[in-house]
């Protein structure tokens, strides 16, 4: 784990400038969630609008929304592909993202252009450097 101030960054994941993370699984699918920075900035989450299974997204499309006491924030698809599973636990317990943002994934995506799109994402060290500029 890398720490930048109060924010934790899990190594081995890929990151976006919009504060989503991507974990590549052995079967080639990816888990997507929001970072520690994102959940701390949002505050206590009250609701996660999960995407529909079967939804096809392009990188940068709105994947879903998360709602906190402070704001409603869009979560963007960090990779293109099809949503093949969602974390149903978040429907009843959105606070799981606040408790452990790197375990509380939002969606599993079957990517269609992973190798190319990963090149455009940051690794943990690059994301840590990016956070220092905010």
UniProtKB/Swiss-Prot annotation:
InterPro entries the UniProt entry points to: 2-oxoA_DH_lipoyl-BS, Biotin_lipoyl, GCV_H, GCV_H/Fam206, GCV_H_sub, Single_hybrid_motif
Domain of life per record: Archaea
Keyword Isomerase in annotation: no
Cofactor(s) listed: (R)-lipoate
Entry-annotated residues carrying N6-lipoyllysine: 70
Domain Lipoyl-binding as annotated: residue spans: 29-110
Pfam families registered for this protein in UniProt: GCV_H
GO terms under cellular component: cytoplasm; glycine cleavage complex
Cofactor binding mode and count: Binds 1 lipoyl cofactor covalently.
Any GO BP: glycine decarboxylation via glycine cleavage system
UniProt keyword terms in alphabetical order: Lipoyl
Function, as annotated: The glycine cleavage system catalyzes the degradation of glycine. The H protein shuttles the methylamine group of glycine from the P protein to the T protein.
Family: Belongs to the GcvH family.
Subunit structure: The glycine cleavage system is composed of four proteins: P, T, L and H.
NCBIfam families documented for this protein: gcvH, PRK01202.1
Protein name: Probable glycine cleavage system H protein
Encoding gene per record: gcvH
């Amino acid at each position: 784990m890398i720490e930048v101030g109060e924010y934790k960054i899990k190594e081995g994941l890929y990151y976006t400038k919009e504060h989503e993370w991507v974990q590549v699984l052995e079967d080639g699918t990816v888990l997507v969630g929001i970072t520690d920075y994102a959940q701390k900035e949002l505050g206590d989450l009250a609701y996660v609008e999960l995407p529909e299974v079967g939804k096809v997204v392009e990188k940068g499309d709105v994947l879903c929304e998360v709602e906190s006491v402070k704001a409603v924030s869009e979560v963007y698809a960090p990779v293109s592909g099809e949503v093949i599973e969602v974390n149903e636990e978040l429907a009843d317990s959105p606070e799981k993202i606040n408790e452990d943002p790197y375990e509380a994934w939002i969606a599993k995506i079957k990517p269609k252009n992973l190798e190319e799109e990963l090149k455009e994402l940051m690794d943990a060290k690059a994301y840590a450097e990016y956070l220092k500029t905010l």
